[in-house]
């Protein structure tokens, strides 16, 4: 049984551009649809420094940056699989992200978006996986970028700086090039890249990292046409909702496909002004919402919880807020109930997607709000629910693995055909399906609309603050400790009701000689030293005599989760916090 968008959702246009870059699609349509006075209106706003760019300024800046980078990196303007050009953006959120990205795209290159919280080891791994030849970063992250680039062989000359604030500037070691200087000294402006017919679907625009259905981080190739398709899908679904240009806020990491596609590019396509904030500081967020009168927020549940906790929202005028979209992780029911009680005018809407899907798969509509649902399928998306025996479900309310097909699907994983083949499957009609690894079901709402519900994650990936954490990544690290014989990582809620990696450890003979607290502290310190903050362990390591396993030797993670304290106890503490 194949499911699709509700009948009241307009159909997806059949003429999605297949020879257009993202920059041309976003900015040229805005440029063509606006009056001269509107073209002088800012579309990009730096939320901290107040710097603004119009459509004209953004495209001119991009062209000059592309010209300068072409000469500096010796990159000709052409897309070519033989001449693979990849530049990594390892930076906090900033408005320069788009000029850099589009300049690389004008050169026929691909942008590898890397989370700013990555450690030097993690950055090194992702630079290798993406085959990056240049890095764009800021002063704050420069030391990490230098360490990782040295290990992968990227020359210091290929590290470029934005003007984000920071103190680490080893100019006495190397005079790093700044973006503003390249733009200022460029002799001309490089024009838009002209893709050939059909190249939009085969030319990667971005590499975003995902753990897929299992295993460590893998580079996902998102094409120009795939991202364009997802933007059109979202806007077609929300066509009846939009009432003229708005001010949107991007506080979610642009290295995450949710922040990149669903928030940033979606807003720019609508003609919104996009305010970009570099961090998830709650006070900064609330202040800019109040100042710019932002009425739609795109958040992850953990950030929403921080906004509502401790009465922080009470000190600001948030009467402008009408809608709150959450994605990246499930919305805790108690958090939804809190919003209903204290902010009844806010429409809280969940959405669902995956990096491999090109991001969004389903979105909640004003027409049919249903608590717990992640909304209705977007136009052009087809879904089916696959039972454990491989057969398709034939009715509503039956759970199984969610498979989706969409024009926005990723090209696949870079240089990993086995993982691509395992995740993307082609049926006998030639249609490609993404195996999401998520257990889901389709249910009919009281209004008769089909809604998607995510039941559980079949895959072992843990979601922390919207970011994916692969258990195997932490397990391999912990096994390097002399006190660890065996280890399994699963998920557990902390006292705030947020998901954290939970370690179950079988100690070695040497480990048994040490106090449990000492071993626990050793393991916590190891993870904190080597991994990003969102990968840090739950404070309480659980020590066991053995790990529950199947007859084939596979760890039974669900049995381990059942050994954790009951969620009801955790939830009770959460309710006292907000």
Swiss-Prot record:
Annotated Gene Ontology cellular component terms: peroxisome
Cellular localization per UniProt: Peroxisome
Annotated InterPro entries: AMP-bd_C, AMP-bd_C_sf, AMP-dep_synth/lig_dom, ANL_N_sf
Annotated pathway: Mycotoxin biosynthesis
Subcellular location, principal: other
Region (SBD1): 281-350
Region named SBD2: 351-413
Job description of the protein: Acyl-CoA ligase; part of the gene clusters that mediate the biosynthesis of the host-selective toxins (HSTs) AK-toxins responsible for Japanese pear black spot disease by the Japanese pear pathotype. AK-toxins are esters of 9,10-epoxy 8-hydroxy 9-methyldecatrienoic acid (EDA). On cellular level, AK-toxins affect plasma membrane of susceptible cells and cause a sudden increase in loss of K(+) after a few minutes of toxin treatment.
Misc. remarks from the entry: Gene clusters encoding host-selective toxins (HSTs) are localized on conditionally dispensable chromosomes (CDCs), also called supernumerary chromosomes, where they are present in multiple copies. The CDCs are not essential for saprophytic growth but controls host-selective pathogenicity.
Protein name in the entry: Acyl-CoA ligase AKT1
Gene: AKT1
């Amino acid at each position: 049984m194949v499911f699709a968008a509700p009948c009241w959702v307009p159909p997806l246009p059949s003429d999605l551009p297949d020879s257009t870059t993202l920059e041309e699609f976003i900015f040229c349509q805005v440029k063509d649809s606006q009056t001269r006075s509107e073209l002088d209106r800012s579309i990009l706003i730096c939320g901290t420094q107040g710097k603004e760019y119009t459509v004209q300024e953004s495209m001119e800046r991009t062209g000059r940056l592309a010209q300068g980078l072409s000469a500096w990196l010796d990159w000709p303007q052409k897309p070519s699989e033989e001449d693979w050009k990849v530049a990594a953006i390892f930076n906090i959120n900033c408005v320069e992200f788009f000029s850099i990205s589009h300049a690389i795209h004008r050169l026929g290159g691909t942008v590898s978006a890397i989370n700013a919280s990555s450690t030097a080891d993690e950055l090194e791994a992702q630079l290798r996986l993406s085959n990056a030849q240049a890095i764009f970063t800021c002063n704050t992250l420069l030391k990490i970028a230098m360490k990782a680039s040295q290990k992968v062989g990227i020359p210091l000359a290929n590290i470029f700086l934005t003007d984000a604030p920071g103190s680490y500037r080893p100019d006495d070691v190397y005079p790093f090039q700044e973006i503003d200087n390249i733009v200022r000294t460029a002799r001309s402006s490089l024009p838009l890249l002209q893709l050939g017919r059909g190249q939009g679907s085969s030319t990667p625009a971005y590499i975003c990292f995902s753990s897929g259905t299992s295993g460590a981080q893998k580079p996902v190739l998102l094409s120009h046409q795939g991202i364009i398709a997802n933007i059109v899908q979202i806007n077609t679904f929300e066509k009846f909702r939009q009432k003229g240009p708005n001010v949107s806020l991007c506080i979610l990491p642009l290295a995450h496909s949710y922040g990149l596609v669903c928030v940033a590019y979606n807003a720019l396509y609508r003609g919104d002004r996009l305010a970009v904030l570099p961090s998830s500081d709650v006070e900064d967020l609330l202040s800019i919402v109040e100042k710019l009168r932002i009425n739609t927020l795109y958040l992850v549940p953990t950030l929403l919880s921080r906004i509502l906790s401790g009465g922080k929202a009470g000190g600001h005028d948030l009467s402008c807020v009408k809608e709150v979209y959450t994605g990246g992780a499930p919305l805790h029911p108690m958090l939804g109930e809190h919003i209903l009680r204290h902010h009844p005018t806010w429409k809280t809407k969940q959405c669902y997607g995956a990096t491999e899907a090109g991001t969004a798969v389903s979105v909640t509509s004003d027409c049919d709000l249903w608590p717990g649902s992640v909304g209705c399928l977007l136009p052009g998306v087809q879904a089916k629910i696959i039972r454990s025996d491989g057969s398709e479900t034939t009715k509503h309310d039956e759970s199984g693995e969610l498979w989706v097909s969409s024009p926005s699907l990723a090209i696949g994983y870079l240089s990993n055909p086995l993982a691509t083949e395992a995740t993307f499957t082609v049926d006998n009609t030639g249609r490609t399906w993404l195996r999401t690894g998520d257990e889901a079901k389709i249910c009919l709402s009281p209004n008769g609309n089909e809604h998607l519900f995510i039941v559980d994650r079949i895959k072992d990936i843990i979601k922390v603050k919207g970011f994916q954490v692969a258990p195997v990544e932490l397990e391999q690290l912990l096994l390097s400790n002399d006190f660890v014989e065996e280890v399994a990582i699963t998920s557990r809620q902390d006292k705030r009701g947020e998901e954290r990696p939970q370690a179950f450890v079988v100690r070695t003979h040497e480990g048994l000689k040490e106090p449990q607290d000492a071993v626990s502290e050793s393991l916590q310190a190891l993870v904190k030293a080597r991994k990003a903050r969102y990968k840090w362990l739950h404070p309480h390591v659980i020590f066991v005599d053995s790990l529950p396993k199947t007859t084939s030797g596979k760890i039974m993670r669900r049995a381990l989760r059942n050994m954790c304290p009951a969620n009801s106890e955790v939830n009770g503490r959460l309710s006292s916090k907000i």
